[in-house]
């Protein structure tokens, strides 16, 4: 297989994504059964973080260790990237010493440039524009709880942010209808709306957006780097809180997801994570298994079976 990167969901075909989700579920069962599977012995993952994270670091580092490989954590203080070295130079050097690289940063153009000059696969672990790894975990979680998401209705509640953008791509790739309930001025990127208008719609009324939905998803009102907007956003999003009563408007088989960390009392009610329809803890764990499946896919020509 030629060099492949995972910068957005659109980098994989529908069939590849569906196979990856099923493989992630298999890996979860293998891990829970105590099965040892180490195809990455002697392989190294480079982890470049310009944005901090709990779940991203733990899931990638643990996953690489479970696969028998090793992971190197690189913060801006640990690399010349933080001192102004051109991205293309860092990409050439770092990729010559590791087997695969994940990057969690701000501008999406950084991971695109890194991928252009890298000799190994690049994984987008989050940018301001997209969060594709989280969508792999979300799709795996829905698959495990409810089966195929094709032809289902998904409701996104809140900011049209990077998570929302990746859900728009997922709607196209996995074949579901996405309703976005966002206040005026916080809708998704117009270009993305135009591209995915066949499967994505804006429904400003939250109650209407939730009607008959099979999956309801939300995220924080102010993402990392938007802390100065917190008070303004809290006012604008006050009627966009996800609660058990909102889920009552949805399909009887609805499930709720949140990529975490969650702010109880803001985008969700204090009791939402504990509602029996919430699958957020499985969703969080599945970051580990989905990313293991992704790394296995990207390095499948080099692994030991």
From Swiss-Prot:
GO biological process: arginine biosynthetic process via ornithine; citrulline biosynthetic process; L-arginine biosynthetic process
Reactions catalysed, as given in the entry: carbamoyl phosphate + L-ornithine = L-citrulline + phosphate + H(+)
Subcellular location: Cytoplasm
Pfam families: OTCace, OTCace_N
InterPro entries: Asp/Orn_carbamoyltranf_P-bd, Asp/Orn_carbamoylTrfase, Asp/Orn_carbamoylTrfase_sf, Asp_carbamoyltransf_Asp/Orn-bd, Orn/put_carbamltrans, OTCase_ArgI
Catalytic activity, EC: 2.1.3.3
MF (Gene Ontology): amino acid binding; ornithine carbamoyltransferase activity
Predominant location category: cytoplasm
Binding site for carbamoyl phosphate: 53-56, 80, 104, 131-134, 259-260, 287
Pathway annotation: Amino-acid biosynthesis; L-arginine biosynthesis; L-arginine from L-ornithine and carbamoyl phosphate: step 1/3
Keywords (A to Z) from UniProt: Amino-acid biosynthesis, Arginine biosynthesis, Cytoplasm, Transferase
Any coiled-coil regions, as ranges: none
Keyword Cytoplasm belongs to the record: yes
GO CC annotations on file: cytoplasm
Binding-site residues, L-ornithine: 162, 219, 223-224
Database matches in NCBIfam families: orni_carb_tr, PRK00779.1
Family the UniProt entry places it in: Belongs to the aspartate/ornithine carbamoyltransferase superfamily. OTCase family.
PANTHER family (UniProt xref): ORNITHINE CARBAMOYLTRANSFERASE, MITOCHONDRIAL (PTHR45753), ORNITHINE TRANSCARBAMYLASE, MITOCHONDRIAL (PTHR45753:SF3)
Function in brief: Reversibly catalyzes the transfer of the carbamoyl group from carbamoyl phosphate (CP) to the N(epsilon) atom of ornithine (ORN) to produce L-citrulline.
Name of the protein described by the UniProt record: Ornithine carbamoyltransferase
Annotated organism of origin: Psychrobacter cryohalolentis (strain ATCC BAA-1226 / DSM 17306 / VKM B-2378 / K5)
Lineage: Bacteria, Pseudomonadati, Pseudomonadota, Gammaproteobacteria, Moraxellales
Gene label: argF
